[in-house]
Structure formats: C-alpha cells, structure tokens
C-alpha cells in the first residue's frame, strides 16, 4: 500500500471513531507514522483529506452494495439484500456510525464539499432503492431511506444490532400493503 492510501485509511478510521473536527492533522500524522511533509505532499489541507476519505468511502460502499445484490434477479429480494447489507455493517467490529451522516452534521453548510458528498451518497442510495421498487411504490424510496437512517442511528446510539432487520420488516409492511 502506498503512503497516500495508508494516510487515507488511518484518517478514515480516526474520523469514523472520533469525528472530523476532533481529529487533528497531528494525530493523523502520528497514527499513520508519516512526517508532516509527507502528509502535505499528498493533501494540501485536512479538508482535502476529508474529501478524499468521503469519496473513497462512497465508492467502497456503493461497490460493496452492488456486489451484494448483483446476482439476485428478483427486485424484492434485492431490496431485502440492501437491508441485509446494512445488518452486516451494523454487526461488524468496525461499525461506529455513518461517515456521511457525520459529515452532514459536522459540515452543516450545504455548500461545503463534505456536505455535498454526503448528499450525493444519500441520493445514490435512494436511486438504488427506487430502482428496486415496483413502479407503483417508487414514492416509498425516501421512506425506506429514513428507515435505514433510523436503523443506523439505533445501531450506533442504542447498540441495537437487529435495527436493520426491524427496518426491513417495516419496509415489507409498507411495500406489501
């Protein structure tokens, strides 16, 4: 792994665990075992590093979700797999909440690039869900996103490891109604 990617991975872990504003460049440098010169060779600022972290995480999550659902032919089952993907994430040892939700919270100005990436991630996930819903139920996509967001918070804040499963049961009730 090259140094730039190593810095990104360390920063991702730190931002995920502590948030964006709390983690300083000095901590990233220390944990990554690199010099300030090396850090700034790859990233002009902490803001640039945050953007890179979010962009890579967006690609990673989208790719992982796509791989999870790609072999299933039934859209309803694919939708269930979206919730299953979240269940697996919530129950992983590295789960500490959503980097995109943290970005939207810590960078509340919608013109900030970190906030825009968070909005793009949410829009992309909504597009996936909308695509999987029957034409007559496309209006439910934002509601299913809310269920997933609520499940994410329940898993993070309350430690509810079954939050995604509960959200799927509610989603099923809405879709099959």
Predicted segments, located by residue:
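Amphipathic alpha-helical segments used for helix-helix packing
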Residues: 90-116
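Generic hydrophobic, amphipathic alpha-helix propensity
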Residues: 3-11, 28, 53-57, 61
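Short, solvent-exposed amphipathic helices
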Residues: 67, 113-128
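Hydrophobic alpha-helical connector segments
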Residues: 52, 66-92, 141-144
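Helix-turn-helix
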Residues: 6, 10, 14-48
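Hydrophobic/aromatic residues within well-ordered alpha-helical segments
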Residues: 46, 53, 57-61, 75, ...
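Hydrophobic/aromatic-rich alpha-helical bundle segments in the mid-to-C-terminal region
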Residues: 114-119, 135-175
